[in-house]
Amino acid sequence: MTYFQTLFYEQHTNVIEYNGITYHRFWPIQVDGDIILSLKFVEQRSKYTQAIVLMLPHNFDGSVSISENHIPIPKTSFPALNFWEDSAPREFDVSIKNFTGEIKICNGADPIGTKQFCKHLSEGCAMIVREIGQGKYSFQCNDHEFDGNCDNLVFELEIRKKTKDKGMVCVNPNEKHR
């Protein structure tokens, strides 16, 4: 099997069809104001520690919190927050406030066991994304190895937006939400 990274690069895209299955390198989420990402680890079947990775743009000027606790954003060219399956809560909410733009979610893996390095968007990393409800998605992920079975990490995401008249509502990740 060819690395997913090679297939994504050869086709100049972040979404590919391979053996009749659609694979995503990452999943874009349009943000306009404040949203809540409800994340849930469902299953892990890898010899490597797995992570849900939230990638922020280099010009991110909003704020991120988990359970009302502010999360400092790394001061790097490509800031990312790694939520490791063995240390993050099984279910948690990530609040993103005061930001308009695109964030990305993908999977990652720790190839050396230190959590100081997270392989994502490279080698075998890819995801099968399925809609399982209004604003709710299942991600079946492959780690950085060649196998391509996308069973190394399974997680779910629900995207909610606070509205003036309806309270919290589930929303589509690829539309601007006002």
Positions of predicted regions on the chain:
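Acidic, proline/glycine-rich low-complexity IDRs
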Residues: 118-178
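Extracellular distal adhesion/interaction modules in secreted or cell-surface proteins
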Residues: 1-131
